[in-house]
Curated annotation (Swiss-Prot):
This is Sensor histidine kinase ZraS. GO terms for cellular component: plasma membrane. Activity of the ZraS/ZraR two-component system is repressed by the zinc-bound form of ZraP, which probably interacts with the periplasmic region of ZraS. It catalyses: ATP + protein L-histidine = ADP + protein N-phospho-L-histidine. Residues 1-14, 224-465 are cytoplasmic. The gene is zraS. It is a multi-pass membrane protein.
């Protein structure tokens, strides 16, 4: 069953990683497709207008050519242009000379006026191929978007090779070449502008939806990772509590069985110490027996404290006062080892509900471990600050020898110690007290560069079971 459960957990882990990756790929592909398709509809509509403009220009050139062959005058060309300007979507037709002066126009009143200045005509640089640009023109008393198509007006192009000359056409100084003329046609681009706006709106909606899917996937992935991390922490806490319960039953029996003989051993050791001369070997052995009995009794007491839920006396406390008091308790020891204690009170720090004696015990354990890790000449820094609106953080940083990477995970395990004379229960008790407050404790360390213990405590504590 454990083998099957292991494979299920592994499959779920891989699936949780593959699904976001697959969604990222799909979102990327859809985004590329949407971006590539953007502008396709408006480009097709614009191409339709360009082709229509080309047909009308060629028709006007053809009509002009026929009229020239039949000796039609300029008035007939003007009439032809006015008739063609009645096509749906056409705003106006105009034929200008090289200086931008209107020769013929769909609006007869514009003939002889300047459509564009010579400098603007130079910038437009009309050639034999159609060109286009977006402009705003006045129509029916309002400004509308227009697509302006223009190129050189070449009514004589089809007559070359037939020995014919146009009548009524302007000539340049060189009589072999006609004066350059430019034909302009303006189409109503309102539908084109609406199509582009619709394309932009639809593209924006699709991209926003894809971005929302991507964001939802990222959030779901991080929430899943957070859930897995919380699940693992909960399982670890349950396993630790199960071990503590088992140890509690064992410790209760061991304490009862050990303490009674210890009391007898300690009493006999004191009896022999009083009956033997001071300085003698028997006297020293009796004192060693008494000290070892005290040490063993202390270990049993620490074990009982670890496995039994701590009874907290919660009250509103000022962390600045607790930290200052706990530092004063170790100041003499730190001063004798030339270790600096650094702490600056945070006057804006919220008061929290906690057991001041238990918190002092926690901090003392961390200070003493730091002093032991430093040895001589170092620094212990303590900082307290708020984390959001409902938690505070206490960090204890030392400049000691640090903790090896392979020891970090086991640092809070009962009976694990890096000290030759330690019991390995100090940090386990610290973790137990912090968790009873509803908080958490973590450690970071780089071997040779010290360690940082971080404690998270809720502002409003509720004793945990």
């Amino acid at each position: 069953m454990s083998f099957i459960r292991l494979h299920k957990d592994a499959a779920a882990t891989w699936l949780s990683r593959l699904l976001p990756a697959a969604i990222f790929i799909l979102v990327g592909l859809f985004s590329i497709m949407v971006i590539r398709d953007y502008g396709r509809e408006s480009a097709a509509a614009r191409q339709t207008l360009l082709e229509k403009g080309n047909v009308l220009i060629r028709a006007l050139e053809s009509g002009t050519r026929v009229g020239m062959g039949m000796r039609m005058h300029h008035a007939q060309q003007q009439t032809l242009l006015e008739e063609m300007a009645g096509q749906p979507g056409v705003l106006w037709f105009a034929v200008t000379d090289a200086q931008g002066v209107i020769i013929t126009h769909s609006n007869p009143g514009m003939v002889g006026k300047s459509l564009y200045s010579p400098s603007e005509m130079h910038q437009l640089n009309p050639g034999p191929q159609e060109r286009w640009r977006r402009v705003d023109v006045a129509a029916n008393g309002e400004t509308v978007p227009a697509l302006e198509i223009y190129r050189q007006f070449q009514p004589l192009f089809g007559m070359r090779g037939h020995g014919m000359r146009g009548h009524g056409m302007a000539r340049s100084a060189n009589d072999d070449e006609p004066a350059k003329q430019t034909i302009f046609i303006a189409f109503d681009a309102s539908e084109l502008a609406a199509t582009q706006a619709r394309e932009w709106r639809n593209t924006l909606i699709v991209l926003s939806a894809l971005a929302a899917v991507l964001l939802a996937t990222l959030l779901a992935f991080f929430w899943h990772q957070r859930y897995q991390r919380s699940h693992r922490e909960l399982l670890d806490a349950m396993k630790r509590k199960e071990k503590l319960v088992a140890m509690g039953h064992l410790a209760a029996g061991v304490a009862h069985e050990i303490r009674n003989p210890l009391s007898s051993i300690k009493g006999l050791a004191k009896y022999f110490a009083e009956r033997t001369p001071a300085g003698g070997e028997s006297h020293e052995l009796a004192q060693v027996m008494a000290k070892e009995a005290d040490r063993l009794n202390r270990v049993v007491s620490e074990l009982l404290e670890l496995v039994k839920p701590a009874h907290l006396t919660l009250q509103t406390v000022n962390l600045n006062d607790i930290i200052t008091h706990s530092l004063n308790l170790v100041s003499q020891d730190a001063q004798s080892r030339e270790i600096q204690l650094r702490f600056t009170a945070n006057e804006t720090l919220k008061r929290i509900q906690a057991d001041p004696d238990r918190l002092t015990q926690v901090l003392l354990n961390l200070y003493l471990n730091a002093i032991h890790a430093i040895g001589r000449q170092g620094t212990i820094s303590v900082e307290a600050k708020e984390s959001g609106t409902d938690r505070v953080i206490i960090t204890v940083t030392d400049s000691g020898k640090g903790i090896a990477p392979d020891q970090l995970e086991a640092i809070f395990t009962p009976y694990f110690t890096t000290k030759a004379d330690g019991t390995g229960l100090g940090l386990a008790v610290v973790q137990n007290i912090i968790e009873q407050h509803g908080g958490a404790i973590k450690v970071k360390s780089i071997e040779g560069k010290g360690a940082v213990f971080t404690i998270w405590l809720p502002v409003i504590a509720r004793q945990q079971d």
